[in-house]
Swiss-Prot record:
This is Sprouty-related, EVH1 domain-containing protein 1. Residues 6-123 form the WH1 domain. Transmembrane segments: none annotated. It comes from Homo sapiens. Residues 135-147 have a biased composition (Acidic residues). The keyword Membrane applies. GO terms for molecular function: phosphatase binding; protein kinase binding; protein serine/threonine kinase inhibitor activity; stem cell factor receptor binding. Residues 334-442 form the SPR domain. Palmitoylated by ZDHHC17/HIP14. Phosphorylated on tyrosine.
Length: 444
């Protein structure tokens, strides 16, 4: 691969986790570390094409941390088969190649799964199906622009007395409305001296200026009907105070996109508050702040300074101080286990499913559920080593009855397995009451 692929940019990365890269050994029917054991930095990223047509290639790259050796490098495709066997082990299949990752925590596994899903969505929506379709769409757009520009020119230059010397200009690249209007205004002023009138005794200069103003008003009307770019008379855009600017973490945005689907009500109040804040103008006189003014003439009155659009911005090189947290809904932090935001006032036991739960672990060991999982892995797993949860009540599974019969038979050999169901029900009641389960832990 090229150096650009090897050193992917942070803006083009979808996920970056630490895991052990595994490969499938068909001879033994198990998974072995790829390229030797060791923790690797695995990244899902894209490499845009240089043609700038919106297409890109998506890769999964694994680099071992101890010696910087590339142990995994594969390109993502639409026909990817992704399996989540356990919370800390996922594997996928591309063509005839099988790879897997053993993660350090379930949060890393979910972050990698979200990155894979986003990459597959971008692969499905990113590029057109064929090059001929893209060229056909460009030709159709160019023909529409040619027809519209020819109608404007015929309407504007239908006077026979005007002698034009304007060079030919291709209509494939369409200028902006303001640039086109300014260019034609200069053209009108330059052509005013070439207009001749048959009646002597009239002021040629005044007639020329009237003609120019009339053509400019017609051109403004045509631009309004075609482009429909409304402009406000005066618009003031100002920024908040330095202490009220909130620093945005790109990782928070990356994780928040998929968290919104699982917890849509969590961000509803924040979005409504952001919309309300966007309509409020903050104005604070400060001599240290630098403002830049950009004026753009109005469509109907080009020479009027009152109808100019004024944008006030601050230089981007200004250092931003630490943000002040909002106190309306309590202090919110991000959990280090599930990467979700939580409120400290509502953080009780049972809120985080990925946090360490010693009671649940004790129930798992006392009831000897490891024996049940071992039996299902060796007797009822598929070719990829996947098997259903031992106590799953999903009747759509084709081995539902056989699995429960095997568990009942195994319970006669290991009687302590019968304690799992009542203990697990008591544990769930404790989670509902806030007495059992894991709690969120703030990052940092």
């Amino acid at each position: 691969m090229s150096e650009e692929t090897a050193t992917s940019d942070n803006d083009n990365s979808y996920a970056r986790v630490r895991a052990v890269v595994m490969t499938r050994d068909d001879s033994s029917g198990g998974w072995l570390p790829l390229g030797g054991s060791g923790l690797s930095s695995v990244t899902v990223f894209k490499v845009p094409h240089q043609e700038e047509n919106g297409c890109a290639d998506f890769f999964i790259r694994g680099e071992r941390l101890r010696d910087k050796m590339v142990v995994l490098e594969c390109m993502l495709k639409k026909d990817l088969i992704y399996n989540k066997v356990t919370p800390t082990f996922h594997h996928w299949k591309i063509d005839d190649k099988k790879f897997g990752l053993t993660f350090q925590s379930p949060a890393d596994a979910r972050a990698f799964d979200r990155g894979i899903r986003r990459a597959i969505e971008d692969i499905s929506q990113g590029c057109p199906e064929s090059k001929n379709e893209a060229e056909g769409a460009d030709d159709l757009q160019a023909n529409e622009e040619d027809s519209s520009s020819s109608l404007v020119k015929d309407h504007l230059f239908q006077q026979e007395t005007v002698v034009t010397s304007e060079p030919y200009r291709s209509s494939n690249i369409r200028p902006s409305p303001f640039e086109d209007l300014n260019a034609r205004r200069v053209y009108m002023q330059s052509q005013a001296n070439q207009i001749t009138f048959g009646q002597p005794g009239l002021d040629i200069q005044s007639r020329s200026m009237e003609y120019v103003q009339r053509q400019i008003s017609k051109e403004c009307g045509s631009l309004k009907s075609q482009n429909r770019v409304p402009l406000k008379s005066i618009r003031h855009v100002s920024f908040q105070d330095e202490d009220e600017i909130v620093r945005i973490n790109p990782r928070d945005i990356l994780i928040r996109r998929y968290a919104d689907y699982r917890h849509p009500d969590m961000w509803k109040n924040d979005l409504e508050r952001d919309d309300a804040d966007s309509s409020i103008q903050f104005s604070k006189p400060d001599s240290k702040k630098s403002d830049y003014l950009y004026s753009c003439g109005d469509e109907t009155k080009l020479s009027s300074p009152k109808d100019s659009v004024v944008f006030k911005t601050q230089p981007s090189s200004l250092k931003i101080k630490k943000s002040k947290r909002r106190k309306e809904d309590g202090e919110r932090s991000r959990c280090v286990y599930c990467q979700e935001r939580f409120n400290h006032e509502e953080n009780v036991r049972g809120k985080c499913q990925d946090a360490p739960d010693p009671i649940k672990r004790c129930i798992y060991q006392v009831s000897c559920m490891l024996c049940a999982e071992s039996m299902l892995y060796h007797c009822m797993s598929d070719s990829e080593g996947d098997f259903s949860d031992p106590c799953s009540c999903d009747t759509s599974d084709d081995k539902f009855c056989l699995r429960w019969l095997a568990l009942v038979a195994l319970s006669f050999i290991v009687p302590c397995m019968c304690c799992y169901v009542p203990l697990r029900m008591c544990h769930r009641c404790g989670e509902a009451c806030g007495c059992c389960g894991g709690k969120h832990k703030a990052a940092g």
